[in-house]
From Swiss-Prot:
GO molecular function: cysteine-dependent adenosine diphosphate thiazole synthase activity; iron ion binding; protein domain specific binding; protein homodimerization activity; zinc ion binding
Entry binding sites for substrate: 94, 114-115, 122, 187, 218, 233, 285, 295-297
One Pfam entry name: Thi4
Keyword Transcription regulation (UniProt): no
Signals that turn on the gene: Up-regulated by osmotic stress, sugar deprivation, high salinity, and hypoxia. Up-regulated by abscisic acid treatment and drought stress. No effect of thiamine, salicylic acid or paraquat treatments. Down-regulated by dark incubation.
Modification type 2,3-didehydroalanine (Cys): residues: 216
InterPro entries found in the cross-reference section: FAD/NAD-bd_sf, Sti35, Thi4_fam
Result, substituting residue 211 to F: Disrupts thiamine biosynthesis and DNA damage tolerance activity
Organism encoding this protein: Arabidopsis thaliana (Mouse-ear cress)
Disulfide bonds, paired cysteine numbers: none
Protein name: Thiamine thiazole synthase, chloroplastic
């Protein structure tokens, strides 16, 4: 299992202040940036389909069979995941990365809840609806792990379209037998027993968005040993995990993210990813909301590595081998540096 790429080392770094930056004031060159694209050669081989496209017909099927197959399989999944190991709330870049990391252990059952029909969050595009995805080094090592190509620059890499990352990690993740994505499903609330988060309250997303117009639409539940909240920054449906913790008195305040500072923000997001209350780990831009870290803008490395760290923290909380406390056994990539979680730097919310 690969360790986590980040800008911090677990064993050899001195403690940093809350929002220390890794940027050292290097001058920005006025010269045009070389795109540096390498020429690629493609070979196209003609293949013959195993059917006649001019006289194609499908095998017959009864409409009721289609209905039964969809219903039976979905209901089986709902029964199976009514009590699970980990629930990841939010399938953006951080949530998908967390689920990917956790599910490397085939014995851990992972449910992903995403209120949108289309998972991926903001990772289908770069900034301002542009296509390219910018990832600062050394987070590109995660792209190497999942097999996403990029154009390499000195301190960062560029994926030609953000959708390449999202579609790749999603296809790898959903192919794993211990993962189930429940999209178009909203997490309306948390299950809390004593002082520990023990799962989420769920409903169809369209129902959750229309409680003001309809009545008698009670929810469902999904119990979990660990909840990973990756609900993004504040907005109509953002940062819902930490906002709910505040409203029920489990944390004191949610100051909200500060103005944009990429060099400070990305290090802080990874460093401050943690289990904020027993049973609930916060990752991605939701970390900025609870800690008042700066927003990072259209760079995605911290989302990936924060998600990886959250995944390893979840494994640790489950008492399983993980990269946080060094109990991971296997073929670790020596060039990957673990994102340290210095308890002295944990901020009281």
């Amino acid at each position: 299992m690969a360790a986590i790429a980040s800008t911090l080392s677990l064993s050899s770094t001195k403690p940093q202040r809350l929002f220390d930056s890794s940027f050292h004031g290097s001058a920005i060159s006025a010269a045009p940036i070389s795109i540096g694209l390498k020429p690629r050669s493609f070979s196209v081989r003609a293949t013959t389909a195993g059917y006649d496209l001019n006289a194609f017909t499908f095998d017959p099927i009864k409409e009721s069979i289609v209905s039964r197959e969809m219903t039976r399989r979905y209901m089986t999944d709902m029964i199976t995941y009514a009590e699970t190991d980990v629930v990841v709330v939010g399938a953006g870049s951080a949530g998908l990365s967390a689920a990917y990391e956790i599910s490397k252990n085939p014995n851990v059952q992972v449910a992903i809840i995403e209120q949108s029909v289309s998972p991926g969050g903001g990772a289908w595009l770069g900034g301002q609806l542009f296509s390219a995805m910018i990832v600062r080094k050394p987070a590109h090592l995660f792209l190497d792990e999942i097999g996403v190509a990029y154009d390499e620059q000195d301190t960062y890499v560029v994926v030609k379209h953000a959708a390449l990352f999202t579609s790749t990690i999603m296809s790898k993740l959903l192919a794993r037998p211990n993962v189930k994505l429940f999209n178009a499903v909203a997490a309306e609330d948390l299950i809390v027993k004593g002082n520990r988060v023990g799962g989420v309250v769920t409903n169809w997303a369209l129902v959750a968005q229309n409680h003001h117009t309809q009545s008698c639409m009670d929810p469902n539940v999904m119990e979990a040993k660990i909840v990973v909240s990756s609900c993004g920054h504040d907005g109509p449906f953002g940062a819902t995990g930490v906002k709910r913790l505040k409203s029920i008195g489990m944390i004191d305040h949610v100051p909200g993210m500060k103005a944009l500072d990429m060099n400070t923000a990305e290090d802080a997001i990874v460093r401050l990813t943690r289990e904020v209350v027993p049973g609930m780990i916060v990752t991605g831009m939701e970390v900025a909301e609870i800690d008042g870290a700066p927003r990072m803008g259209p760079t995605f490395g911290a989302m990936m590595i924060s998600g990886q760290k959250a995944g390893q923290l979840a494994l640790k909380a489950l008492g399983l081998p993980n990269a946080i406390d060094g109990t991971l056994v296997g073929n670790l990539s020596p060039e990957l540096v673990l994102a340290a979680a210095d308890s002295a730097e944990t901020v009281d919310a």
